[in-house]
Amino acid sequence: MGDCVAPKEDLIFRSKLPDIYIPKHLPLHTYCFENISKVGDKSCLINGATGETFTYSQVELLSRKVASGLNKLGIQQGDTIMLLLPNSPEYFFAFLGASYRGAISTMANPFFTSAEVIKQLKASQAKLIITQACYVDKVKDYAAEKNIQIICIDDAPQDCLHFSKLMEADESEMPEVVINSDDVVALPYSSGTTGLPKGVMLTHKGLVTSVAQQVDGDNPNLYMHSEDVMICILPLFHIYSLNAVLCCGLRAGVTILIMQKFDIVPFLELIQKYKVTIGPFVPPIVLAIAKSPVVDKYDLSSVRTVMSGAAPLGKELEDAVRAKFPNAKLGQGYGMTEAGPVLAMCLAFAKEPYEIKSGACGTVVRNAEMKIVDPETNASLPRNQRGEICIRGDQIMKGYLNDPESTRTTIDEEGWLHTGDIGFIDDDDELFIVDRLKEIIKYKGFQVAPAELEALLLTHPTISDAAVVPMIDEKAGEVPVAFVVRTNGFTTTEEEIKQFVSKQVVFYKRIFRVFFVDAIPKSPSGKILRKDLRARIASGDLPK
């Protein structure tokens, strides 16, 4: 019998902060409102546009009323509802109400085209849509065909219910719901490391764990308290905002100031008026703050925490923003929808903060494990060596909805979620992201799936082949550009192709440049060699 070789141990990294107790058995809504006895009469939500304010007790009660209203409309435990909404108080009531009902919320971008919304409606099998009147036309025909109820938060068109009907329901008529911690509560859509958008199943346990990793314990990684005012400018259909603002904000008892869309002057006015203390942002907002000359006219001294996520932030931009917020700690977090979403967070935000390095995106969150692996061999790597970032813990997704194959390629047999991002962990446990294995393009923090745009381009009668890759852009971070092979004899122009795409997709998926080539580089198995195309862009070797 040959020698027995011991398996090589994984090199696993953990947070500098000690693990904490996490009440993973609690439903998400119970967990978020667990401290309501201390904050019940305090302002919970402020509508920035109108000044309307809701206390914690009112938000909790209205959420239970919405749950009862959903029940009366026939929404059962395990059913899915779609939130097709901008940021608004109703977003909170609808999401939390669905959670109380034991239902699932799938969040869709209201700027999606009709085709994009319907694709998500079909995939998620949503039974009800909560939206605004201006978006009803996108879904009304499909909803009528499938007998899906539409509810509007403003003036309800014909055949639509008004959201007030849900808020007027009697919460005492809501039947008791027994929620399993492994039940799905949120279903955002993400392209993951490759391919088309897929439903990401986030459970009660997963979101409770993710929120606790950030804001719970004696020394929270993200220190927030009941005197804080947090601005909600990031769209709640994005998991970063849903988690870091809605869930973390409620758990920590902060006041959440809601803005529908980013506009620099109203944004600065609200920060000054309400003395905002916490700003969860993305790089395009950080860039606007750094470059806008009007910023200096406003008093931003109340802001103590500026966190940036969804895409990396450069050192120069970090320094420019620090100058605008004199009393703020600035740092980055790193997330991925499938990871719940937070993998790493800056320890400068902790109650007892640590010194951090510029350009780092934090250290791995508590109650989780991280490793860096060689993308070719899957062997774990030591500090300061670049490899694929992997995360393991209760916060990660249950899997992709109805897609076991994609789930298996993302979460391995040992429970490690493979992110498709390349990075390294330094001697001080700080994580740096340097590249991306995955195909996703990040436009202002929004995901763009190349496969989706390639499939669309190939429906054009004069295009025989196409590939979509990112190009660096100062304002957007990255923009999608297309390499296109024209069908023999056709002289289709760049502008014609750009218009063809823009009519069918949301604004951030529009093609910014089209380069005509004789062939798309591919591997022997037929896979597009995106690295070759990215290298051509980087070197400036582009067709005229």
Curated annotation (Swiss-Prot):
CDD domains tied to this protein: 4CL
EC class name: ligase
Catalytic activity from the UniProt record: (E)-4-coumarate + ATP + CoA = (E)-4-coumaroyl-CoA + AMP + diphosphate; (E)-4-coumarate + ATP + H(+) = (E)-4-coumaroyl-AMP + diphosphate; (E)-4-coumaroyl-AMP + CoA = (E)-4-coumaroyl-CoA + AMP + H(+)
Residues annotated to bind (E)-4-coumaroyl-AMP: 240, 310, 332-333, 337, 345, 438, 442
Cofactor(s) in the UniProt record: Mg(2+)
Binding site for CoA: 261, 444-445
SUPFAM superfamilies reported for this sequence: Acetyl-CoA synthetase-like (SSF56801)
Purpose of the protein: Carboxylate--CoA ligase that may use 4-coumarate as substrate. Follows a two-step reaction mechanism, wherein the carboxylate substrate first undergoes adenylation by ATP, followed by a thioesterification in the presence of CoA to yield the final CoA thioester.
Name of the protein described by the UniProt record: 4-coumarate--CoA ligase 1
Organism: Petroselinum crispum
